[in-house]
Amino acid sequence: METLAQHRQARSSAQKVRLIVDLIRGKKVPQALNILTYTNKKAAFLVKKVVESAVANAEHNDGADIDKLRIKKIFVNEGSTMKRMMPRAKGRADRILKRTSHITVIVSDR
């Protein structure tokens, strides 16, 4: 049984989150959570929350055994970008792009 969890508008760029996602793709859930716990990045914390949510969904909705679950699919898409201005010298302004991402995790017991 496949179970999905998403975190939309995560306040980290898709490029940064993909570095973490590539570490755990295809791994068993306990091993993936262990990797995420000891990875010292903000994106690892965000991905860990989504994986834990997918595991909780699988356990509650489908009655799945946590030890048999594995990360079947995990991907990151770009979210919307918040545009901000930073004042500069001589009345000019630079544009600041605060990027977001959509994190999707699908766990399966097969």
Curated annotation (Swiss-Prot):
- Give the domain of life: Bacteria
Gene Ontology BP annotations = translation
Q: Which Pfam families match?
A: Ribosomal_L22 (PF00237)
Give Gene Ontology CC terms: cytosolic large ribosomal subunit
Q: Does the keyword Ribosomal protein apply?
A: yes
Task: Name the CDD domains on file.
Answer: Ribosomal_L22
Q: Which InterPro entries match?
A: Ribosomal_uL22 (IPR001063), Ribosomal_uL22_bac/chlpt-type (IPR005727), Ribosomal_uL22_bac/org-type (IPR047867), Ribosomal_uL22_CS (IPR018260), Ribosomal_uL22_sf (IPR036394)
UniProt cross-references to PROSITE patterns, sorted A to Z: RIBOSOMAL_L22
Cite the GO molecular-function annotations of the record.
rRNA binding; structural constituent of ribosome
What are the record keywords, sorted?
Ribonucleoprotein, Ribosomal protein, RNA-binding, rRNA-binding
Share what the entry says about its subunit structure, partners included. Part of the 50S ribosomal subunit.
Q: Which HAMAP family match?
A: Ribosomal_uL22_B (MF_01331_B)
Write out the function statement from the record.
This protein binds specifically to 23S rRNA; its binding is stimulated by other ribosomal proteins, e.g. L4, L17, and L20. It is important during the early stages of 50S assembly. It makes multiple contacts with different domains of the 23S rRNA in the assembled 50S subunit and ribosome. The globular domain of the protein is located near the polypeptide exit tunnel on the outside of the subunit, while an extended beta-hairpin is found that lines the wall of the exit tunnel in the center of the 70S ribosome.
The text of the family note is: Belongs to the universal ribosomal protein uL22 family.
Q: What is this protein called?
A: Large ribosomal subunit protein uL22
Task: List the source organism.
Answer: Buchnera aphidicola subsp. Acyrthosiphon pisum (strain APS) (Acyrthosiphon pisum symbiotic bacterium)
Organism taxonomic ancestry: Bacteria, Pseudomonadati, Pseudomonadota, Gammaproteobacteria, Enterobacterales
